[in-house]
């Protein structure tokens, strides 16, 4: 029986023997494709080749790719743990041909690998082929069927519809028929009862697809019509975990050696045993799956956060923590302890896990602890919601309240339902679902984008010349219209461009396209599938005419200064804080720079000052730029160049060197460090567990900041009569102010006591109720203190109502003793109604409530209204 490692190696070895170049997995987190957050298929890293944006370096390629499916149409998250085969992170084994072999070889080699190499029983295999689509003029894929007939009986070759057997990259782009290979893993007696043929593509857990062979031969246009693809592509994908299940004779992916080490470790932590309790088993499967996703995401540079891809990772982590909390009794952080087990099973194949172990553990542990605190907060809020609901004589909490818990505090619905059941209560699920759908619709509306077809003026690829030129003669290769948020923009592709496209944390260039007829403003430059896209608000009237591409040089120079400064900061931080410092992200704009780095505690003011001094010393030294352009990656490593985890580098790279600062980098930089002028750190903060952030200014922005500081200092000196020592003068002022504040507080306490005593002497007893009412100008905090003091002294039958004014703002305050609350009076209900008379609103607890308003003249009437509503 092959282990997971042996299976992965056998696939690569087989296709290497067929002339394929074995390439490493691309990062699971995608940084240069706005249409995707995560790699969700093996073909993602080859999109630019498939789309024709770049030539293929190798015409035959194979790999094992880390994938993540948790958003968009490829969203398996809610299935994970509840069945035997869905995962968030999974490995995709794949082989590709770019204009080389096609259907015959793809089918032949798939069969050879499965049957001859892996020794799978051919009698248990089925193949599907595209049945055709008359409405699109597409015939059945008889070519693929004829090749399958060389290996399979006809009753093992099944026609598949467009949904299952016609693969499309998206609404537009390359597409084509596909042929899926399915395997029947049922026992012999089950196979004898019903043919596997009848269960293919019917969601049977033991009759499953293991390999999809995609034959890309068409291009889908924006009007939905198809045209032939100039260079045909083979794109295959085989689920690694499913393959291991088939080879190891298991009925669940989670029973293979891919997951079992993790599941056993989880069971040991929880003091339970896998296979004894279905709900516990689901929890263990969820955690085993999710720890892989979280660890690899952090490794590839995506930290949990509250935005975009980071939010997805945080949701996955919290889902796992919640399952451990609810079903396995894990009330303390526990997931980070699974990392050694994961490294033991996957560290050889993915050494980046080992290199990033300390950071991964730190981030996961702090995220767990943070969410556990959130869970405790959510439970307290749910307790209050339950109490309020019961007080109103109900046993069902509103779906809106449950959604607020979910959306604001990350408190999952099923945990809410579990706690409610334990308290004999329910939740309005339909209302919750309606709130969820409204939120999703708002998100869809905000993200809706309509993209037209590319209008191709001439064939060709883009050459970036921006390292050497800021102006360059060019012509348009293609363009298209894009509509989003009621705005129409145009995307333009040039044959030569000096415009730097946003990447590596540096914002894209702006500028103009100019010819004798007109000037077109370029408002941004983005990168899609490694293709520079120039964004404009209008098209040239003569798009086929040559144009001069001119970059905004002031913006470019400012970006270059800030980008070079990040390199100097990176080196200085390692020198001051230690070699554990690694860049985790950056943002380079013309106005400022932001640099995120791994470090496990706050950087002290003294350390920041040392970093600043080191950077500015290097700036004063005016160290010249040494650019090593397009050098072999091994040569770059020999130079000592620093690479970023989570970045995918080609065989040839660009290295930027300022003396001892040597980094892989594709951005724009100053010719010498002196051009930066000066660096001033303006803030240091935490952005995630184990990750700190520095923000800084350079050059002219530093001068502006120093001017502002000098002006502020001058104003302060004037305020303190030009005191010779401003620090001493300010401290003296603070001390005097503290003394005066203490005197005021003492006076207010005396006033509170005097008011309270006067009120006690003027208690009105009405029908056995001790009523205290008044209208006075008084701060809200003083009224509250008096109310609670009176409640402490009059423990029964107290009814306190006060109308007060502070800074011309009216306030209504009601305090009721517990026995009156038990009798049916609710302070919150009373102030809510009476507050209308002061043009306001409010509420609170049954025994204490307040309401603010805009009309002080209505206070007396409001106080009387409270008494009237209370029946006093």
Swiss-Prot record:
SUPFAM superfamilies: Class II aaRS and biotin synthetases, Putative anticodon-binding domain of alanyl-tRNA synthetase (AlaRS), ThrRS/AlaRS common domain, Translation proteins. The keyword Metal-binding applies. PROSITE patterns: AA_TRNA_LIGASE_II_ALA. Binds 1 zinc ion per subunit. One of its GO terms (molecular function) is ATP binding. Zn(2+) binds at residues 563, 567, 665, 669. It comes from the Bacteria. Its EC number is 6.1.1.7. GO terms for biological process: alanyl-tRNA aminoacylation. Keywords: Aminoacyl-tRNA synthetase, ATP-binding, Cytoplasm, Ligase, Metal-binding, Nucleotide-binding, Protein biosynthesis, RNA-binding, tRNA-binding, Zinc. It catalyses: tRNA(Ala) + L-alanine + ATP = L-alanyl-tRNA(Ala) + AMP + diphosphate. GO terms for cellular component: cytoplasm. It is found in: Cytoplasm. Its cofactor is Zn(2+). Catalyzes the attachment of alanine to tRNA(Ala) in a two-step reaction: alanine is first activated by ATP to form Ala-AMP and then transferred to the acceptor end of tRNA(Ala). Also edits incorrectly charged Ser-tRNA(Ala) and Gly-tRNA(Ala) via its editing domain. Consists of three domains; the N-terminal catalytic domain, the editing domain and the C-terminal C-Ala domain. The editing domain removes incorrectly charged amino acids, while the C-Ala domain, along with tRNA(Ala), serves as a bridge to cooperatively bring together the editing and aminoacylation centers thus stimulating deacylation of misacylated tRNAs. PANTHER family: ALANINE--TRNA LIGASE, CYTOPLASMIC, ALANYL-TRNA SYNTHETASE. Belongs to the class-II aminoacyl-tRNA synthetase family. This is Alanine--tRNA ligase. It comes from Bacteroides fragilis (strain YCH46).
């Amino acid at each position: 029986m092959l282990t997971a490692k042996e299976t992965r190696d056998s696939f690569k070895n087989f296709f290497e023997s067929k002339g394929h170049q074995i390439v490493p997995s691309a990062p699971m987190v995608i940084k240069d494709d706005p249409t995707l957050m995560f790699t969700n298929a093996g073909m993602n890293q080859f999109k630019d080749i498939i789309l024709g944006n770049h030539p293929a370096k190798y015409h035959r390629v194979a790999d094992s790719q880390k994938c993540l499916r948790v958003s968009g149409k490829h969203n398996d998250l809610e299935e994970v743990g509840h069945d035997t085969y869905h995962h968030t992170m999974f490995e995709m084994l794949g082989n590709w041909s770019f204009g080389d072999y096609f259907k015959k070889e793809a089918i032949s080699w798939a069969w050879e690998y499965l049957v001859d190499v892996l020794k799978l029983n051919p009698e248990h295999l089925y193949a599907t082929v595209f049945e055709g689509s008359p409405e699109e003029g597409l015939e059945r894929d008889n070519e693929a069927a004829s090749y399958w007939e060389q290996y399979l009986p006809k009753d093992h070759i099944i026609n598949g519809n467009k949904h299952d057997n016609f693969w499309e990259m998206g609404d537009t782009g390359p597409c084509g028929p596909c042929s899926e290979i399915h395997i029947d893993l049922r026992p012999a007696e089950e196979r004898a009862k019903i043919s596997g043929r009848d269960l293919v593509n019917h969601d049977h857990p033991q009759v499953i697809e293991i390999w999809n062979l995609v034959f890309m031969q068409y291009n889908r246009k924006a009007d939905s019509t198809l045209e032939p693809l100039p260079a045909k592509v083979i794109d295959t994908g085989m689920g690694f975990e499913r393959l291991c299940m088939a080879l190891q004779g298991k009925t669940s992916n989670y029973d293979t050696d891919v997951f079992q080490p993790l599941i056993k470790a989880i069971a040991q932590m929880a003091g339970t045993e896998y296979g004894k309790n279905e709900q516990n088993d689901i929890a263990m499967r969820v955690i085993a799956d999710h720890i892989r996703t979280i660890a690899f995401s952090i490794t590839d540079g995506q930290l949990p956060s509250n935005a975009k891809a980071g939010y997805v990772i945080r949701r996955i982590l919290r889902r796992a923590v919640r399952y451990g909390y609810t079903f396995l009794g894990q009330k303390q952080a526990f997931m980070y302890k699974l990392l050694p087990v994961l490294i033991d099973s996957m560290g050889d194949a993915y050494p980046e896990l080992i290199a990033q172990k300390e950071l991964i553990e730190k981030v996961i542990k702090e995220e767990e602890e943070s969410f556990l605190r959130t869970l405790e907060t959510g439970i307290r809020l749910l307790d209050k919601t339950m109490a309020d609901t019961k007080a109103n004589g109900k046993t069902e909490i509103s779906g809106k309240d449950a959604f607020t818990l979910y959306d604001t505090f990350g408190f999952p619905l099923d945990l809410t339902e579990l706690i409610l059941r334990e308290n004999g209560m329910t939740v309005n699920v339909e209302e919750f679902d309606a709130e969820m759908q409204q939120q999703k619709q708002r998100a869809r509306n905000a993200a809706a984008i309509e993209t037209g077809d590319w209008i191709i003026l001439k064939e060709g690829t883009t050459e970036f010349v921006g390292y050497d030129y800021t102006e360059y003669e060019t012509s348009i290769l293609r363009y298209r219209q894009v509509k989003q948020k009621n705005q129409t923009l145009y995307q333009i592709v040039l044959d030569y461009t000096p415009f730097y496209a946003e990447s590596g944390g540096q914002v894209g260039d702006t500028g103009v396209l100019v010819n004798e007829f007109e000037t077109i403003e370029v408002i941004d430059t983005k990168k899609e599938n490694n293709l520079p896209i120039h964004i404009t608000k209008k098209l040239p009237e003569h798009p086929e005419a040559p144009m001069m591409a001119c970059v905004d040089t002031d913006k470019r120079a400012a970006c270059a200064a800030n980008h070079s400064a990040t390199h100097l900061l990176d080196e200085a931080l390692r020198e001051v804080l230690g070699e554990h410092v690694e860049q985790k992200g950056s943002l380079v704009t013309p106005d400022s720079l932001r640099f995120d780095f791994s470090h496990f505690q706050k950087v002290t003011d003294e350390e920041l000052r040392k970093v600043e001094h080191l950077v500015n010393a290097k700036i004063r030294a005016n160290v010249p730029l040494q650019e090593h352009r397009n050098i072999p990656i091994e040569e770059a490593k020999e130079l000592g160049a620093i690479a970023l985890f989570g970045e995918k580098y080609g065989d040839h790279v660009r290295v930027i060197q300022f003396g001892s600062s040597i980094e892989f980098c594709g951005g724009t930089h100053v010719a010498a460090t002196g051009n930066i002028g000066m660096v001033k750190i303006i803030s240091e903060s935490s952005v995630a567990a184990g990750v700190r952030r520095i923000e800084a200014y350079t050059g002219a922005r530093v001068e502006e900041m120093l001017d502002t500081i000098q002006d502020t200092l001058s104003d302060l000196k004037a305020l303190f009569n030009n005191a010779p020592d401003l620090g001493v003068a300010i401290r003296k002022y603070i001390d005097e102010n503290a003394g005066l504040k203490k005197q005021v507080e003492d006076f207010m306490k005396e006033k509170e006591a005097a008011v309270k005593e006067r009120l006690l002497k003027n208690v009105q007893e009405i029908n056995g109720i001790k009523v205290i009412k008044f209208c006075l100008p008084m701060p809200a905090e003083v009224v509250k203190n008096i109310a609670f003091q009176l409640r402490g002294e009059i423990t029964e039958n107290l009814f306190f109502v006060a109308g007060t004014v502070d800074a011309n703002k009216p306030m209504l305050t009601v305090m009721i003793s517990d026995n009156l609350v038990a009798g049916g009076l609710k302070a919150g209900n009373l102030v809510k109604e009476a507050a209308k008379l002061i043009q306001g609103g409010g509420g609170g607890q049954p025994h204490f409530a307040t309401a603010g308003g805009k009309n002080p003249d209505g206070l007396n009437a409001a106080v009387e209204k409270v008494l009237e509503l209370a029946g006093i």
